[in-house]
Amino acid sequence: SSQVLYYISNTTSELDDPDPTKHIGLYLNTLKNVTIDGCGSTLLMNGEMTSFVLDKCEGIVLKNFNIDYKHPTQTEVEVLEEGNDYLIVQVHPTSQYRIVNAQLEWYGDGWSFKNGIAQSYDRISEMTWRSWSPMENLLRTVELRPNVLYLQYKEKPQVGLHTIFQMRDSFRDEVSGFVNRSKGILLENINFYYLGNFGVVCQYSENITV
């Protein structure tokens, strides 16, 4: 990846992140009248990355490609069984975990977290909202079999079978895409299969079409 220092609005503060270097998959700087047609290809990010940056560019077209992450920094579990003080959950195949001294940790290339924030999804109502996190008040974790975990709690709310929890660190050190001091930009038929700690941010730019 290209590693370039950028200060981006609403990302993690200088106090928490003294080195705001971005790790960039597709980096366009001071270019004019360039079209990149992915013809349906997928740009697969590994680790915490900013998928693309357009800096001081004009007349740029990015089109017909997908952006995805090998191991998204937002992890996911589905509730298979629930008791008063425990959950049994199915871990999504793209979510990596490790258990050390009965403590659960999520990780990927260059990142890890044990706490963070969560949102939950109800399949029946098709509603998603910010919620209690399955990492809160967690006493111990046991792997029943690969990608199926027993989570025991000091206390927990009732959550409901087949509730899906998505968890992430609240640390925003990268964005999904960044357009800076540019104009006349067209983002056409780009599928973001995962938006990381932030979406696409445009700063000091004009005439952006998506």
Predicted region positions:
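Beta-strand-rich solenoid/repeat architectures in extracellular/passenger domains
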Residues: 19, 37-47, 65-76, 120, ...
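Charge-rich, low-hydrophobicity low-complexity segments
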Residues: 148-157, 193, 198-201
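Active-site pocket-lining segments that scaffold enzyme catalytic pockets across diverse folds
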Residues: 185-200, 206-210
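Short, exposed beta-strand/loop patches in secreted or surface proteins that constitute
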Residues: 36, 74-83, 121, 127-144
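Extracellular beta-strand-rich solenoid/capping regions of secreted or surface-exposed proteins
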Residues: 2-35, 44-63, 71-87, 170-183, ...
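Generic recognition of long tandem-repeat/solenoid scaffolds
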Residues: 85-93, 139-156
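Extended Gly/Ser/Thr-rich low-complexity repeat segments
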Residues: 66-68, 95-133, 156-182, 190
